[in-house]
Amino acid sequence: MANGAQNASGTPAPAASRSGGHVVSARATTIGLMAILLWSFMAGTVRIVSENFGATLGSALIYTVGGILLLMFRRPAPIREFPKKYLIIGGLLFVFYESSISLSLGLASTDASSVEVSLVNYLWPTMMVLLSAGVSHRKHAVVKVLPGAIVATAGVVLTVGGNSGLDWHAAVQHIAANPLPYALAFAGALAWSVYAVFTPAMSHGVDGTSLFFPCVAVALWIIHFASGQGWPAEPPSLVAWLFVLIAAAAIGGGYACWGYGILHGSMERLAIASYATPVLSTGASAVLLGLALSLPFWCGALLVAVGSVLNYLVSARK
């Protein structure tokens, strides 16, 4: 067909069925949304693992186990089937994002700085929404999604920062005194949004998640050994190892679902839904760690919902 596919009755297939150069599958979009639910357990489980194994060793163990699980249950295609452009650019972006987030949290000097760095990292849903709008070829798409993006981003700040007692004056001082973790978190957020929006078109439908994930594990082991940190003084308990497995399954499973979703589902829908990631993550962490959810959290969650609905309405109005 020269200009668009036709269905059995000869009627042209609707343009809305295509996104990012592929035919959108509702099933794939749903699978992509499952990633957001799985990732909600990431922060809490990683925190528990880090308390028992240390930050760098804990991350390396999680991604090693996650990589093994992916290779067992979702083996990657043979290397020769991967487009070289996707393999190089996609692989570098994936590994850089994961490594930069791990490093940025490790370099944060205080608990308050860790919260601030996490907030910078959570700019990726906003970046992803704006990039998705920018490549959609719809007139004034970026301007139209901007109000919803601003509202949702303000909600993320309230959800994550407000629930942790974020002090903006102190945050500015922390950035001035130790800018590297914040710069890494920002660069990582940008890298992940670029990966999600642009690499599906390079992949020709081949998902590299199961191949990229073990590469992250290698990078994290290098970071661990370079940091000079060794094994914990006391052997971690069986429960600690169980949380390594849970974190690995949640993170690895999340990336597997996300990879399938961005390749075959609706990028715009997934981008908008990704605003829920920090909200669900903060909520799940509070449950796992026995923390209370303050009023700013609920106000932020409401703003995220409002901003997401605004962007959904814009995207639905083709």
What are these regions (language model features)?
Residues 38-45, 75-121, 158, 247-265:
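Specific transmembrane alpha-helical segments of multi-pass solute transporters/efflux pumps
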Residues 43-44, 67-71, 125-134, 166-230, ...:
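Transmembrane alpha-helical segments that form core, pore/gating elements
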Residues 49, 58, 104, 134-137, ...:
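Hydrophobic/aromatic residues within transmembrane alpha-helices
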